[in-house]
């Protein structure tokens, strides 16, 4: 596992959850002796929706809603076997989507 790299992508609607989860991953990787780059904050995706409040007239009366998707990127440059085992056993919050890629 000396020349490999682990890239972890995190997505969440709550920025506190994603920061907490990324901190847990970084601490776990550093504890096992791996070199870590990140967490790198990626651009936040904002989806905005405008909804008419009135069913018939009053087009000026609208409600506005938005969904923010926060993303973080963590690179583990020199993972050890202990690092992979520790990351597999790590229990993260339910509101965080985790994608792991080996490269």
Curated annotation (Swiss-Prot):
Keyword terms: Ribonucleoprotein, Ribosomal protein
GO biological process, one term: translation
GO cellular component: ribonucleoprotein complex; ribosome
GO terms for MF: structural constituent of ribosome; tRNA binding
Keyword Ribosomal protein found: yes
PANTHER family: 30S RIBOSOMAL PROTEIN S10 FAMILY MEMBER
Protein purpose: Involved in the binding of tRNA to the ribosomes.
SUBUNIT field: Part of the 30S ribosomal subunit.
UniProt record similarity statement: Belongs to the universal ribosomal protein uS10 family.
Name the UniProt record assigns to this protein: Small ribosomal subunit protein uS10
Gene: rpsJ
């Amino acid at each position: 596992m000396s020349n490999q790299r682990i890239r972890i992508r995190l997505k969440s609607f709550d920025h506190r959850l994603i920061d907490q989860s990324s901190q847990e991953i970084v601490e776990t990787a550093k504890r096992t002796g791996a070199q870590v780059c990140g967490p790198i904050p990626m651009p936040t995706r904002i989806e905005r929706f405008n909804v008419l409040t009135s069913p018939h007239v009053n087009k000026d009366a609208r409600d506005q809603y938005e969904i923010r998707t926060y993303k973080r990127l963590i690179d583990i440059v020199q993972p050890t076997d202990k690092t992979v085992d520790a990351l597999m056993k790590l229990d993260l919050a339910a509101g965080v989507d985790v994608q792991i890629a080996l490269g």
